[in-house]
Structure formats: structure tokens, C-alpha cells
């Protein structure tokens, strides 16, 4: 139940199913508790790793914990009864690795359940497929599968994909930065609606913007300082390894007239990115 000391942004009338309970899941749980009205007895967390503090943290929050992996073979049988149990409309929060975002979205659409995730994730094995070429193993290719689904099946129950920090919140920040830039340049303009893609593109062109570079500053600090000449990964271990096996990718604007020697263009989709023949 939401704490009245915090603003409550909405009510979830049905069950809530959170898939994955790593660092992002553990950080998201308190936010759901603070900012949504819901029946905590109808919330469940699914994660294959009960060891450590996972199960205990869920128990301390009064949330049911299921120790099981969501796989290509079991996801429909596992998730459907959990998301449709009882009255109201359920809500699926996918914060896991190795679970196909696209398949989960399709399932949620079938059973009329809103869905949100932080990245377009494939099923286990995608990043280690030695038979796949570099183009099909890119994040661009993964995102295009969702874009194609939208084109084929518009409308339906809301699904919000890639809504983490980056990608996600950075898109909102870029819009505000563009508005600030236009004001600083003394331009006469009307701020486009949030979903007016063409309007934002025209404003970007009018302001003379050709490239957007987003730099992230990691402010995490460990109790024991990192020794010199060492590398510590403060991100997802699974994510770091899997993305390290993918080709390097770059967003590539329509104004670009050249590309690196080892760069390749995509043959399908919006073609807004290129990839390098190297990690």
C-alpha cells in the first residue's frame, strides 16, 4: 500500500508481477510501494535466485516470492494465472535478463495486462549464438523487433519498453535540453507535444543539432576503495558480459556522409544506427 507521505500517481487494481529481483528490482519495489495504490497481498516477485537476501527482502516487504526462472517453455503457464488472478487489471514489471521482452509483451496484450521494462531483452542464448551474424545480434535489431510488432499490431493494452535510465529517461531529458537550447538561441518556436516525433525532429533541425552525446557519470562508491590499475564492473554482471559479446553500435544521423572502415549499415528497419565489426 502506498505511503501517504509520498505522492500517489495511480492505482493498480489487479495483481502485480515483478520478473527479476536483482539490483534494479530491489530498487524498484520501494518505488511501487510509495507511489501506487495496490493490494500488497496480490503482488508476487519471480526470480530464480532465492539465495542471498532476495527471498528475505521480499518477505520483509510482505511480498510473495517465487523461486523460478521465466523461460521460453514455461512463461505462458507461469505468468498467465498470476497476472489474471482475481478481479481488476494486472500489471507486469519485467526487470530480468534472458526473458524475451517481445514475447512477454505479446502475452500481456493477449490477457489485457499493462507491461513495462527497461530494455528489449531476448531469451537465454541470444548473445552466445555462434550461428547468428553480427547485424542480428545488435541492440538495434532487438529494438526493431518491437518496432515491427507495433507497426503490425497498433493499439491494444499499453506496453512501455526501454523505460529505464538510458534508454528511457534520457529521452525526456533530451527533449527538455532541446527546449532550453532553443530558448538560449533566441528562437521563436512552439514546443512539440510529447509524442510528436516529426515536430521534435524539425525543432532539432531548426536549432542546428546534428549529434547528441549522452555521458553517464557513475557516482557509486564502495566501502573499500578500488585499487589502482584495476577494473570493477558496477553494472549488471550478466549485462556486461552479454553486451561485451555484441558488436559496438553507434547512432548514425542522416547528415553523416562517411562511416568508419569497419562499420556496417543495417538493411532493415529505420536504419538509424550502424555497427562495427568488433566488440
Q: At which residue positions do the language-model features occur?
A:
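A short, basic/flexible loop-to-alpha-helix module at the beginning of a structural domain
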Residues: 1-14
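Glycine-rich adenosine-cofactor-binding loop
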Residues: 12-30
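Glycine-rich, aromatic-lined ligand/substrate-binding cores of catalytic
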Residues: 209-279
Amino acid at each position: 500500500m502506498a505511503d501517504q507521505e509520498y505522492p500517489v500517481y495511480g492505482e493498480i487494481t489487479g495483481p502485480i508481477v515483478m520478473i527479476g529481483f536483482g539490483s534494479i528490482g530491489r530498487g524498484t519495489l520501494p518505488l511501487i510501494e510509495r507511489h501506487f495504490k495496490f493490494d500488497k497481498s496480490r503482488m508476487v516477485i519471480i526470480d530464480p535466485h532465492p539465495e542471498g537476501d532476495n527471498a528475505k527482502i521480499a518477505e520483509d516487504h510482505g511480498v510473495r516470492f517465487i523461486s523460478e526462472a521465466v523461460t521460453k517453455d514455461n512463461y505462458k503457464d507461469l505468468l498467465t494465472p498470476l497476472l489474471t488472478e482475481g478481479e481488476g487489471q494486472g500489471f507486469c514489471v519485467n526487470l530480468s535478463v534472458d526473458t524475451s521482452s517481445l514475447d512477454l509483451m505479446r502475452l500481456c496484450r493477449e490477457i489485457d495486462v499493462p507491461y513495462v521494462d527497461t530494455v528489449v531483452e531476448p531469451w537465454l542464448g541470444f548473445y552466445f549464438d555462434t550461428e547468428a551474424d553480427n547485424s542480428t545480434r545488435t541492440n538495434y535489431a532487438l529494438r526493431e523487433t518491437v518496432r515491427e510488432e507495433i507497426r503490425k499490431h497498433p493499439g491494444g493494452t499499453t506496453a512501455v519498453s526501454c523505460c529505464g535510465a538510458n534508454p528511457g529517461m534520457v529521452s525526456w531529458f533530451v527533449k527538455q535540453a532541446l527546449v532550453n537550447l532553443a530558448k538560449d538561441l533566441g528562437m521563436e518556436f512552439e514546443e512539440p507535444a510529447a509524442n510528436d516525433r516529426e515536430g521534435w525532429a524539425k525543432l532539432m533541425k531548426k536549432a542546428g543539432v546534428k549529434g547528441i552525446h549522452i555521458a553517464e557519470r557513475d557516482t557509486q562508491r564502495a566501502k573499500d576503495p578500488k585499487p589502482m590499475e584495476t577494473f570493477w564492473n558496477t553494472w549488471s554482471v550478466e549485462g556486461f558480459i552479454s553486451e561485451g559479446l555484441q558488436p559496438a553500435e553507434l547512432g548514425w544521423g542522416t547528415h553523416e556522409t562517411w562511416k568508419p572502415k569497419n562499420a556496417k549499415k543495417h538493411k532493415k528497419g529505420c536504419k538509424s544506427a550502424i555497427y562495427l565489426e568488433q566488440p
